[in-house]
Amino acid sequence: MKIRKDLCRVEKDGFFGAYFQNPVETDRCIIALLGDDIDDRMAVSGAKWLQGRNCNVMTMAPARKDYGYHSYPLERFEKASAVIRQKGNRKIGIVGGSTTGMLALAAASHYPEITLTIAMTPCDFIIMCTEQSCKP
């Protein structure tokens, strides 16, 4: 089965993501922070699994093949939520694991339109300047 997706770009949409429309009509969407890209095997497998639970899916990442969530602007979730609503979704959730679990918690605490949060093994601190090139 070919999975349909709409790509979103930082320059045009304010965030980097892929919207996976469920073939079955639904008004629920999960923002999925999985792996290091929006359409790699982990992201697509997660999207298919979530679609099987009657959800549309928006996968997000900092950039193509970039696992640099340490400096991910939370404002991108606001932009993604607007696109998700424009596509007819009334309910928005977010899921992430490990570093992205922490990011899911932070995004949901800032944006009340995100009403379901699944944070799998989140860190217990906010990561700042974790790369050697980061200068405080």
Description of each model-found segment:
Residues 31, 58, 116-118:
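Hydrophobic/aromatic beta-strand patches that form the interior of the parallel beta-sheet core
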Residues 45-49, 106-107:
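A short acidic, amphipathic alpha-helical/loop segment
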Residues 61-93:
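Catalytic nucleophile-loop/oxyanion-hole region of alpha/beta-hydrolase
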